Amino acid sequence: SFDRPNIRYTVVAKDDSRRQLLAFLEEHRGQAGIVYCLSRRKVDATAAMLAERGVRALPYHAGLDADVRSEHQRRFLREDGVVMVATIA
């Protein structure tokens, strides 16, 4: 069903993407979410930057080992407040 009241999709014009992302995540501290990036490299860099700032962020893309992807997906589904950083593909 498309009726998913627990999911919110937001599009915001990009100005200073890093600052905007950090501010958004701070407003929603402790909540789960997905951040989409255009490349695997950007996924890895964004997940690392967020983790350095205390966000429970995990990368997720086809370039990761299948076991790592599976573990990150499991954590996202079972743990509170995990932010998945993924490619759009």
Explain the meaning of each model-derived region.
Residues 1-89:
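Helicase motor core with emphasis on the C-terminal RecA-like subdomain
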